[in-house]
């Protein structure tokens, strides 16, 4: 049986996240959705995954988080293949809010209960997570009565209450109004500053410019660029990347 090593490793102490993607591929129904992706990420900062429609952005994110098994290749955390134990050190927020039929604070304490935390710790973590998300005044409100933006912030607060090493987000602001989007962006900046690695899919070039430290750019399932955000937006190397930034590709 393969021994799962802790995420805090020599690679992490040297500024490298223990995430390596090697020759990753996913084929579904004879169609190659992800095609030979290789990359390694730093353990800090915010990485944006971008690309046109059908590029494989969300699928790559799900592969990284271990929600979908690859057809080929390997995903390593601290040199160890993805496992349930490793995935418990991560959290993910999807485009549409997924919430329990509970109050706002109940959504968080229930998630922490599932992780086996004590009552006092659940309560303190939930209160702090709601405060960070600006939802402390809605703690006892049923999640269903919150606005779309508030529900998404609650999903993010619940994820952050788990104190993950890595936070994955799949277009978390795609259907939100500007004010809700700004609130979530501020929360993500705060999350990054606190040392959590953030990996996010977005089709919004403006949002990527505001948030990204580095950019993964996909085109038809292939990695065409992986570089710092400043370089990607000033000197994109691929034709698809240049067209995307210029707004010439459908996103």
Protein language model features and the residues they cover:
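Helix-to-loop junction immediately C-terminal to a conserved catalytic motif
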Residues: 65
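Conserved ABC ATPase "signature" region
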Residues: 120-138
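Conserved ABC ATPase signature
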Residues: 142-146, 150
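Catalytic Walker B motif of ABC-type/P-loop ATPase nucleotide-binding domains
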Residues: 167-170
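Helix N-cap at the start of a conserved alpha-helix in ABC-type nucleotide-binding domains
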Residues: 178-180
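H-loop/switch region of ABC-family ATPase nucleotide-binding domains
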Residues: 202-203
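A short, surface-exposed alpha-helical micro-motif characterized by mixed small hydrophobic
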Residues: 208-210
